[in-house]
């Protein structure tokens, strides 16, 4: 039995990526990773530093590397984490904007596998980051990236951003409303929160 277990373990480990493969893939996915980091940080320099930090975290990490088929999404998550960590102060400063706002759209509480979130993710990966930065604040951008690319739940966002439920729900509403406007082409600019969010 132990021999079978040992063989299964070796097969599983063989499917995991090596450090060399990860470093090569960091270079291969650099443009995408930098784009994600830029949407979160709003600054090219900070975005590049976030990608570098993600690479350092991977290099110094002790946890098992992902399986090869999970590598791309894993690198995105590590980079998103690094970018959010470097932007927590700017994100927290946006909290007051959502203090008295309330989301009444049940469709905004979608899980990470929903087709609309996948469409939103594709939009964020292809639209000019400067448009996103110019039309959404750091908090809404962070929630948008976490919910779409990171496939985070609302609770995950609360824990990661260290903000209240009401704040995250309102920021999520802002991001989802912006996406709806972009998807349907109703407006060149996202509406202000007061147009789509109801006051308590």
Which ranges hold each PLM region?
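A short, charge-rich alpha-helical start-of-domain segment used by transcription regulators
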Residues: 3-4, 9-35, 45-48, 59, ...
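Short amphipathic alpha helix immediately N-terminal
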Residues: 134-156
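DNA-recognition helix of helix-turn-helix
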Residues: 155-197
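Σ70-family region 2.3-2.4 aromatic/basic alpha-helix that recognizes the −10 promoter
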Residues: 30, 48-107, 172, 176
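Short amphipathic alpha-helical boundary/capping segments
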Residues: 10-12, 117-121, 127-137, 164
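Generic detection of well-ordered alpha-helical segments
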Residues: 27-31, 35, 56, 134, ...
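Linker/hinge segments immediately adjacent to helix-turn-helix/homeobox DNA-binding domains
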Residues: 84-129, 185-198
